[in-house]
């Protein structure tokens, strides 16, 4: 079977994975309304192409936090890649490095940070942090990340408690997972996921100044969906926002990411960069997100589908397919560079 689009990879990955792993990757919170709406919301947006423009040369390159990437298509933080491929995040990191894009490594990576860096020493890496109640543990982890050459700290906001993921509860998957980077990097010190001290439930806006005091890295806040929180992010001098609902895995029945993007972009008034994850499956989706103000998009589940199908090569193929589709979408709407993508290219359908 030829795999020519991201949904092909999804179908093929389902055949490769155990039921519990499929459920872990695909599952949403409660009734999965938000998970599904993340995808459906893109289809409620229509394109307004412009013609008679010279598109013989189309350039997909852009920058995030001052670093050039080959296309505005990067890899979102997802945990436990070894569930779907033996060397897990190391394969993901190598694919991202080869593609010339950014990979956000998760706190819940199944490979150590050191091994990921060794696998892809030249790659652009950010680190996603679930804030632990133990501030010293957070500090040690952030300092470790900084010393390893990660270029930004992404703090996840939307997980003060875990969402109600019914499949994971039924499958008791957590008992088979370990957390490598919440202990010493020495081998053998990983702890079971289900024994982990909970993620901090007391994190608040005033705590951001402490993080800013211990690192020189740009701080990106992941999980913002409202203009009120976007305005607070600017007020607290962070460097970026990822508009995200955690792939519909946390609070169900919230806004689709693409539906929340417009108000967040309007609220920050160009003062900080805004990114998006959730629901991107085609090059048109990438174009729509950029037209509505995202600097780039981050892929979650599709990366795991590629990894499950073919490891590093599967992730490369997923990234290549989406980048080629985006290149085509740019050409067919008259955009020769990412800078030419703007709000006039889209309208919200009345259907």
Curated annotation (Swiss-Prot):
It comes from Homo sapiens (Human). This is 2-Hydroxyacid oxidase 2. Gene3D superfamilies: Aldolase class I (3.20.20.70). Its main location: other. GO terms for molecular function: (S)-2-hydroxy-acid oxidase activity; FMN binding. Its cofactor is FMN. Disulfide bonds: none annotated. It is an enzyme of class 1 (oxidoreductase). A 2-oxocarboxylate binds at residues 130, 165, 249. InterPro entries: Aldolase_TIM, Alpha-hydoxy_acid_DH_FMN, FMN-dep_DH, FMN_HAD, FMN_hydac_DH_AS. The modification Phosphothreonine is found at residue 178. SUPFAM superfamilies: FMN-linked oxidoreductases. Homotetramer. PANTHER family: 2-HYDROXYACID OXIDASE 2, S -2-HYDROXY-ACID OXIDASE-RELATED. Oxidase that catalyzes the oxidation of medium and long chain hydroxyacids such as 2-hydroxyhexadecanoate and 2-hydroxyoctanoate, to the correspondong 2-oxoacids. Its role in the oxidation of 2-hydroxy fatty acids may contribute to the general pathway of fatty acid alpha-oxidation. Active in vitro with the artificial electron acceptor 2,6-dichlorophenolindophenol (DCIP), but O2 is believed to be the physiological electron acceptor, leading to the production of H2O2. Is not active on glycolate, glyoxylate, L-lactate and 2-hydroxybutanoate. A motif (Microbody targeting signal) lies at residues 349-351.
């Amino acid at each position: 079977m030829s795999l020519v689009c991201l949904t092909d990879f999804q179908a093929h990955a389902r055949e490769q994975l155990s039921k519990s792993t499929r459920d872990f990757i695909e599952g949403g919170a409660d009734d999965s309304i938000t998970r599904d709406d993340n995808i459906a919301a893109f289809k409620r947006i229509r394109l307004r192409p412009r013609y008679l423009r010279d598109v013989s040369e189309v350039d997909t390159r852009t920058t995030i936090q001052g670093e050039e990437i080959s296309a505005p298509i990067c890899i979102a933080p997802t945990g436990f890649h070894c569930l779907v491929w033996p060397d897990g995040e190391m394969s993901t990191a190598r694919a991202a490095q080869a593609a010339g894009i950014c990979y956000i490594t998760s706190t819940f990576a199944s490979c150590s940070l050191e091994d990921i860096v060794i696998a892809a020493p030249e790659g652009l890496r950010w680190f996603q942090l679930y804030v632990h109640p133990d501030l010293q543990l957070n500090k040690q982890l952030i300092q470790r990340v900084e010393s390893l050459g990660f270029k930004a700290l992404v703090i996840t906001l939307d997980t003060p408690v875990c969402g109600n993921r019914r499949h994971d509860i039924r499958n008791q998957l957590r008992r088979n997972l370990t957390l490598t980077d919440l202990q010493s990097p020495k081998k053998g010190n990983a702890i079971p996921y289900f024994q982990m001290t909970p993620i901090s439930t007391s994190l608040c806006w005033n705590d951001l100044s402490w993080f800013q005091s211990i690192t020189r890295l740009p701080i990106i806040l992941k999980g913002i969906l409202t203009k009120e929180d976007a305005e607070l992010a600017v007020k607290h001098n962070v460097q970026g926002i990822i508009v995200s609902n955690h792939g519909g895995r946390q609070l169900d029945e919230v806004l689709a990411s693409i539906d929340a993007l417009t108000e967040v972009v309007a609220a920050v008034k160009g003062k900080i960069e805004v990114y998006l994850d959730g629901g991107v499956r085609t090059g048109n989706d990438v174009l729509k997100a950029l037209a509505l103000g995202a600097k780039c998009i981050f892929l979650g589940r599709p990366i795991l589908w590629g990894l499950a199908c073919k490891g590093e090569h599967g992730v490369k193929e997923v990234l290549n397919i989406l980048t080629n589709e985006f290149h085509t979408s740019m050409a067919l709407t008259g955009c020769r560079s990412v800078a030419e993508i703007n709000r006039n290219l889209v309208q919200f359908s009345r259907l």
